[in-house]
Amino acid sequence: MRITLQYIKLESKNTKERDMAESKAIGRSLEVPNVQELAKGKLASVPARYVRYSDRENTTLPPLTQIPVIDMQALLHPNSFEAELNSLHKACKQWGFFQLINHGVEAAVMEKMKLEMQEFFNLPLEEKQKFRQSADDMEGYGQSFVVSDEQKLDWADGFSVISLPTYLRKPHLIPKLPAPFRDAIDAYGAQLKELAIKILGFMAEALGMDPHEMTALFEEGIQALRMNYYPPCPQPEMVSGLCPHSDAGGLTILMQVNEVEGLQVRKDGGWVPVSPLPDAFIINLGDILEIVTNGEYFSVEHQATVNGDKERLSVAAFLNPKMEDNIGPAASFISGETPAKFKTITAAEYFKGLFSKELDGKSYLDLMRIQN
């Protein structure tokens, strides 16, 4: 028994060390100017590097078009479970996005996260710069996916951190934050991880697969938080707060922090503006879920627009597999009649490839497709 326990401890230590090494090596993003400070300068026009559209074609669908709404309490109640599970299945197959109400995350935990996040972005630049991204890292204060000095930039600043597992936290980031902010991240991250696993379990049931086959990929996985700050812009129609893309990870849970809207979802060739419901989360499926379900569910492009007069804040929680896990179609979706549509590679390989490229629609997922 003693030898077995020592072996388990050694394996656990080796896994942690491997995860730490691989998470440090997955990517980098170049340092860029701080947009919040640019906006404070009362610019008459946008600097050229931020101009993405001179004549923007941005077809929005009628205001009555909205992403579906799913009720978590209805999923948990036996009398409404079947109907709500069917609604969830339709939302995932037809939209890849939905709002989740009655989700069970404590209101106080959500409000504390909003407050601490706002206070962080209100800090003087020199204080925020203590948490800036280093030249060889994707985490910290700055912009992600900046891979060249010629690349167009988003009209936004962000603060990205790995929140779970705690042993992957960079010592100069979350541990150095003010205690109230650390506590907010701890409580918020823990409750969102629990919520995400529940959602994935229900998705598995809707798909007719073993729920464990789905949740096992994510239960010990990596949760990352990205806090987004979109300053007011003098020419909002010419820039992107976040350029069109699909999320590369597993499941994304977004919380709107203030009342300013900006998220848009691609649907039927146009863009659907999302009007967040009070206290709801916005859930979207990432590329990894499209791969795992062999295309039964799919990720969807979305973008963030900015406001001419007001700032917008949001925080996204991303749930991904462990770095040593394989990412590929689950066995439930492969048969002689239905071959694999995507390659199988390790999560470490997957994310290294992702972070070496600029965000561009679903182009990275396309690289994972098996060409027949």
Curated annotation (Swiss-Prot):
A cellular component annotation (GO) from this entry: cytoplasm
Biotechnology: Nevadensin is a selective inhibitor of human carboxylesterase 1 (hCE-1), a key enzyme responsible for the hydrolysis of a wide range of endogenous and xenobiotic esters.
Record PROSITE patterns: FE2OG_OXY (PS51471)
Catalytic activity: gardenin B + 2-oxoglutarate + O2 = nevadensin + formaldehyde + succinate + CO2 + H(+); 8-hydroxysalvigenin + 2-oxoglutarate + O2 = pilosin + formaldehyde + succinate + CO2
Regulation: Inhibited by prohexadione-calcium, a 2-oxoglutarate-dependent dioxygenase (2-ODD) inhibitor, thus leading to a decreased abundance of nevadensin (NEV) and absence of pilosin (PIL) production, but to the accumulation of gardenin B (GARD B) and 8-hydroxysalvigenin (8-OH-SALV).
Any single biological process term in GO: response to molecule of fungal origin
Tissue expression per record: Accumulates in the trichomes of nevadensin-accumulating strains (e.g. cv. SD and cv. EMX-1) and in cv. SW (at protein level) but not in cv. MC.
Predominant place of localization: cytoplasm
Assigned EC number: 1.14.13.-
Cofactor: Fe(2+); L-ascorbate
Residues bound to Fe cation: 245, 247, 302
Stated name of the protein: Oxoglutarate-dependent flavonoid 7-O-demethylase 1
Species per Swiss-Prot/TrEMBL record: Ocimum basilicum (Sweet basil)
Lineage of origin: Eukaryota, Viridiplantae, Streptophyta, Embryophyta, Tracheophyta
